[in-house]
Each structure stands twice: as structure tokens, then as C-alpha cells.
Amino acid sequence: MKKILVLNGPNLNLLGTREPEQYGRDTLADVERLCQEAGAKHGVEIECRQSNHEGVLIDWIHEAGREVAAGHMLGVVMNPGAYTHTSIALHDAIKGASVPLIELHISNVHAREEFRHHSYISPAARGIIVGLGVKGYVLAIAALVP
């Protein structure tokens, strides 16, 4: 069974309590359960990981690139959190690993503060899902399934 890696970046471990007016009341555990259900529906294995550390996320993207190249993985769904707006290193990792990646944001970043309007990740992503809440994870998983 092929796999999809779901990566959540900094502060997403606080889902459910951090700014619920922006992100809703679903916890990270709720999101991971939703992703597992979506994976089962599409016949793919889902692996969920979260880190507040840029280097860890980069290492996981490199690992995913090797898994994709070996034919074991379909790609990555990633909510890069605030690294969206700051991390050229994540952009370079995605490009360098040649990993199909769907960038995902729970909130509509374009309707928020000006600094959130630019993404370093988007030019390296296969697609982007923004502002659809946690249901965006389900759509992102479906987008990677052939």
C-alpha cells in the first residue's frame, strides 16, 4: 500500500486551543484521525508528523523524496504554519527532493495580516488549499491519489 505523509509545522500542536476563531476547535489528534479516515477511503496509508523545528521538517521532506523515488510514497500534504512566510530552506528542500507536495492552510491566509500573504512554499508545491478548515486535509489527500 502506498503512503502519503502529512506534515504539520510550528504551533499546529496547539490546534483546538490556539486562536480558535482562526483555526477552529479541532485538535491535532482530530486532524490526524480525519486524515487516517481519508486515507482508508482512498486505500493509502497515512503517516502524520508534527514538528516546531525547521530542520526536522526538512529532514522529513528529504526522506519523503527518497520514498517517492522508490515508489513507496505518493507525496506529502504539508501545513507549514508560519514557516510558509519565512522558509526558503523548506522551499529548497521540496524542490531538491522532487516530492509532490500539497501546501495546506486551515485559515485563509490572504484574509489575514499582510505578512501572511506571501508563501515561499507555494512555488515549490503541486497545489495549494487555503481557508477550508480542517476539511482541506481531506481534499489534499485526495489530490495526491492517482
UniProtKB/Swiss-Prot annotation:
Its EC number is 4.2.1.10. It catalyses: 3-dehydroquinate = 3-dehydroshikimate + H2O. The active site is at residues 23, 105. InterPro entries: DHquinase_II (IPR001874), DHquinase_II_CS (IPR018509), DHquinase_II_sf (IPR036441). It comes from the Bacteria. Pathway: Metabolic intermediate biosynthesis; chorismate biosynthesis; chorismate from D-erythrose 4-phosphate and phosphoenolpyruvate: step 3/7. Substrate binds at residues 79, 85, 92, 106-107, 116. The record marks 18 as: Transition state stabilizer. One of its GO terms (biological process) is quinate catabolic process. Belongs to the type-II 3-dehydroquinase family. Catalyzes a trans-dehydration via an enolate intermediate. Homododecamer. This is 3-dehydroquinate dehydratase. The gene is aroQ.
